[in-house]
Amino acid sequence: MKKWMMAAAVVSLMALSACSNDGSEAIVETKNGNITKDEFYNEMKERVGKSVLRDLIDEKVLSKKYKVTDEEIDREIERIKEAYGTQYDLAVQQNGEKVIREMVKLDLLRTKAAVEDIKVTEKELKEYYDNYKPKIRASHILVKDEKTAKEVKAKLDKGEDFSKLAKEYSQDPGSASNGGDLGWFGPGKMVKEFEEAAYKLKVGEVSDPVKTDYGYHIIKVTDKEKKKSFNEMKDEIAFEVKRNKLDPATMQSKVDKLVKDAGVEIKDKDLQDVIEQQGKQ
């Protein structure tokens, strides 16, 4: 996340610098003196310029051979959201969604380049598919004791509204006001007992009370993603299986080779060791 924030500032700076050849143009004016475009550029270049320049070089070189679709970016962003939570939201607030999408695209370009030489078997792909569970959407009513849970379940069995009862009874401050809605989630996002019970339910079905360390849950599944066929998911699965085998050193080595083969020539003398330094990291 810190890398994305840093890149956002410098990429914006470079775009600003490209708009005009007049580096003496003031971008900040004060009573004690102005700050010119050149001063700003040079200061940012000194602080983080080499790291961001390498990102720009990688993107330019890799995008000639590898393509990343909007759908792939969307899917990766969902994965990042699940991993980083509020940190991702903060990154979007500070940098904007466009910058985040560009950095995700670059990461995917590097990964695609690196996994190109990794082999996977049909057996590995089918095992991944068999273990894959699509996301589900569920609501729940959380209470502290089994007696209350059974009372609530009895009311539901008589046809009372789940959302209304969640607002009345649920002890979960994060979902009670929304009628118990937990949104979409996949495997590993809920405690084991909750997840196992939820995945057994059909859409619209309500569970018996489920005990966890948090109390007793009554779960209702409200929607389920349809699991695509193996052939429909095969390319996506192959990418994930290969990525799971990938290590950072292999990725860097492959990207370095592609950059070297592209004949990159850096004109700014202060940045000429960017590629050499990256290879040593």
UniProtKB/Swiss-Prot annotation:
Tell me which Pfam families the record gives.
Rotamase_3, Trigger_C
Gene Ontology CC terms, in alphabetical order: plasma membrane
- Indicate where a lipid (S-diacylglycerol cysteine) is covalently linked: C19
SUPFAM superfamilies this protein is in?
Answer: FKBP-like, Triger factor/SurA peptide-binding domain-like
> What is the membrane topology here?
Lipid-anchor
Q: Does the keyword Hydrolase apply?
A: no
Keyword Membrane assigned to the entry: answer is: yes
The record ties this protein, via InterPro entries, to:
Foldase_PrsA, PPIase_dom_sf, PPIase_PpiC, PPIase_PpiC_CS, PrsA_foldase, Trigger_fac_C, Trigger_fac_C_sf, Trigger_fact/SurA_dom_sf
Q: Where is the lipid attached (N-palmitoyl cysteine)?
A: C19
- Top enzyme category: isomerase
Q: Name one GO molecular function term.
A: peptidyl-prolyl cis-trans isomerase activity
Ranges for domain PpiC come to 133-223
A Gene Ontology BP annotation from the UniProt entry: protein folding
**Known Gene3D superfamilies for this protein?**
3.10.50.40, Trigger factor, C-terminal domain
Q: Which UniProt keywords apply?
A: Cell membrane, Isomerase, Lipoprotein, Membrane, Palmitate, Rotamase, Signal
In terms of domain of life, where is this protein from?
Bacteria
Report which reactions are catalysed by this protein.
Answer: [protein]-peptidylproline (omega=180) = [protein]-peptidylproline (omega=0)
Give the signal sequence positions.
1-18
The protein's role, per its UniProt record: Plays a major role in protein secretion by helping the post-translocational extracellular folding of several secreted proteins.
Q: Which PANTHER family match?
A: FOLDASE PROTEIN PRSA, PEPTIDYLPROLYL ISOMERASE
**Annotated protein name in UniProt:** Foldase protein PrsA
Naturally occurring in which organism (per UniProt): Geobacillus kaustophilus (strain HTA426)
